[in-house]
Amino acid sequence: MAQREQDILRVDARDKVTGRTKYAADLVFDGILYTKSVHADLPHGKLLAVHTAAALAAEGVAGVYTARDIPGRNVGDNEKPIMVYDTIRSRGDCIAVVAAVSQEAADRAARLVTYDTQPMPAVFDPEEALLPDAPKLYDDGNLILEHRVRKGWAAKGFDEADIIVEREFRTQRVIPGAIEPESVVVSPQDGELRVYCPCKAPFNIRRIVAAACGLPMSAVRVTQPGMGGSFGGKDDDAGAMAARAAIAALHTGRPCRMTWRSSETLLEGVKRHPFHIYYKAGAKRDGTLTAIEVRGFVDGGAYLSKSKTTTWRSGIEATGPYRVEHVDVCMKAAYTNNCYAGSVRGFGSPQIDFATESVMDELAQQLGMTPWAFREKNLLRDGDISGSGQPMRDVSAGACLERLRREFGEDLRPFVRNGKLVGRGIACLYRGESYGAGTPVQDTSGVTIVLNADGSLNVSTGLSEVGQGGHTLLTAIIGRELGLPPERIHIAPADTDYCVDSGSTAASRGTITAGNAAWLAAQEAKQQINTALWEYRGFDGPIVYEDGLVRCGDEQMTFTEAVGVLRNTGRDMRAHGWWAAPKTFWDREKCRGSNYMSYAYGACGAEVEIDPITGKADVTDFVAVHDMGRIINHAATVGQVGGGVSMGVGYALTENADTPGGVTRAADLDSYLLPTALDMCPVRTVLLEEGAGVPPLLVHGIGEPATSIVAPAITNAMSAALGARIDTLPADLETVRAILDEKKR
C-alpha cells in the first residue's frame, strides 16, 4: 500500500478568502456594455420575425442583435444555437441579444423585443419522442444514439434464474448548482477578441467564438479568470454566452459582459439527463446473478451536448461492479422539446447506479440474503469479464465493501427511533474513468514548466482550474519531484495563447491526465538539469532533489544553482510533459469492448430518518469509502467527497428542475431546493490505496465517483425504513407521503 501523502494548503486559498481573486463578474473595463438574452416563450415553433425597433430606441441601448447578425457559423449540427435563426426547439431559446450601458437598461430593452411565431407540435418524453408519429425536432428524426451492450444470452440467463426482479425507474433533471453565476466578458483588444470566461474547456470556447465571429482561432484569446465551481456547467452554456457577448463586442467595438441570474440558469442552462429505465435481473437461490436486461430512455433535450457520452457510459455501467454471464442492455437517447442536457457531475452514472443498486437490494431481499452477502457473492474480481466484455484488473470493489462494513456497521435492519422510521442502506460504485471508447477523441493533456534563473518555476496547462484544487495538485506533484516548496511554483490561469489544448476538466480526468502530464514534465526538467550536472559539474551517479537542494553523493548545491548550470549550457529552460491515455475500443457489431482505461471503485452507506407524519427524510449518518490508488492531497480528496455527497443528497431528496410541458418547474433558487449546510449530516470519508490507478502516478479521479452512488445508498435506506421501494427521484416529501398513505390503506 502506498504511503499517504500529507495534506496540502490550497495555493489559491488566501486570495479567495481575502477577496483578491477576480471572477468574471468582478472584471472592470472602460466603456463596458451589459448584455441580456431575449428568450423564447414556447417549446416548439417557427420563428417568423423579430421586432427590435422599440428596444433599439430605448435609453442606453447600444445594439440589438439576432441570428442574422452572426457573421460566422451559428454552431454545429443539432447543437444549441447561439441565437435561433428559424426554428425554436425549446422554451428559453435565445431570440435576440441586447447590449446597453447598464444591466438595468439591457433588462428593460429586452422586454421590448417582440417576435412572431408559428407554434408546432412538441414532445417532452424521450420514449414518446421515438415513436413513429412523434413530432420531429430534426429532419433525420429524434434519435440521438442507440447503445447496445451484449454478453451471452439474456433469455438463457433468465431461464437459469430462480428469482427475477423487474422494476421501472425514473430520474429527474437537476442543475450543476455552482456557487458562482455564469458570466463572461469579451473585449476587442489589439486586433483580437479577448474572452474572459470561467469554463471547463477554454479551447472549446475559443472554437465556438471564432466560428461564430468568422475569425481564425488565432484571433480569439480565451483567458480563465477565477472560477467558483462547475459540476458539469460552464461548458456549452459558457460557449453560447461568450459567442453572444462576442457578437455584441464585434458590432460595437466595446467590451461586453453577459452574466446570468439564477432564473436564466434554470430556464436556459444545461441540466442532468433525466432517465426512464426498465431494469430486469435474475439470480439463483444461492445468490448468483444469472442475467441482467436493461432498457433505458435518455432525455437529451432539444440540442446535442453530452447525450452520446452519457448514454454510452450508462450502458457500460448498467451491470454495476457485478459478475454476470448474460447481459442485454439497450440505452436510447432522444431529442425532446425540453431544455438540453449535458455532463452534470457523473453524467450517466448517478442515473443508472440508482436503478442497478436498487435492484441488487431487492434481489437480496427476495433471496433472504443481506445486502452485504448478495453483493459480496457477485462482486467483480481480477480476471473476471465485465458485463460489457472487458477483462478486469486492479478491482478493489471487494476491499471497499469490506471497509464500509467495518466503518458503517453490519446491521442494516430498519428500526424506530424517537417515533421516526430509520433505515440503513448501501450501494457500490463501478465507474469508468475519463472519456472512454464512447468519446471519439484521444484523451491527452500537457503541462509545461519554465525554469527561471532564481530557481522558481512558471507552469502552464490548458486544463482548467474550476475550483476543485487542480492547481494545488499540480503544484504538489511538481514540488515533490523537484524538491521545491509551493511558493516557488506559479501556475498561470489557462490561456489559449500560451497553453496547449488539454481537453476539458470533466469526467474526473483532471488528476489523471494533467497530474500525469505534470509528473512527466517534472521528470524532463530533472533530466535536463541532471544532464547538465553530469556533463559540466562532474556529478557522477543518481541525483536527488529535496528541500530546495540537489544532491549527488557528497556533492550538493541549491536548486537555483543547478538551474544556473543548465542555463549556462545554452540548453532549453523549458520542460514539457505530454500524457496520452491508453487506447480503448468498442466493437459495435459484437456490442462489447475494452471500454475505459481504468475504473473507480467505492462503497457508500447511508442512515436515513423519516418522519411518518410529514414524510420528511433526513440523512443522519453517511460513510463514503473510495479507492484512490494513490492519494496526492488527502485534505482536498476528503473535501471532494464531502461536496459530492452533498450533491448526491440533493439529487436523492429535494432537487428537481423538471420541465412539464417544457416549462421549468423551478423558476429560481427559492423554489429549486438545493441542500444547505443545515441539511447535511457529517460525512465519514475513508480513502483506500488498494488498486493500482492510472500510471505513472497510479491515481484515480474522485469528483464524480463521490456523487454517483449517494442517491441509491439513501433510497435503499428509505426503502428499508418504509417497506416499499423508492423508484423515482427525487424521493421528496410528496413521494414519501404517498407511500405512507398507501401503506395505511
Where on the chain are the PLM-derived regions?
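Glycine-rich loop/linker segments at domain edges
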Residues: Q6, D12-T18, L143-V184, P274-V359, ...
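Short acidic, glycine/serine/threonine-rich loops at helix termini
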Residues: N74-N78, A109-L112, R206-I208, F231-D237, ...
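Short, aliphatic-rich beta-strand segments
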Residues: T35, L193-C197, S456-T461, V619-D621
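Flexible, low-hydrophobicity surface segments
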Residues: M1-E146, I164-R167, H251
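Thiamine diphosphate
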Residues: R207, S230-G253, R257-T259, G470-I478
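C-terminal catalytic domains of large/alpha subunits in multi-subunit enzymes
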Residues: A67-R68, G214-A219, A249-C256, R285, ...
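Helix-loop-helix junctions that connect adjacent transmembrane helices in secondary transporters/permeases
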Residues: D133-C213, L379-S456, E589, R665-D679, ...
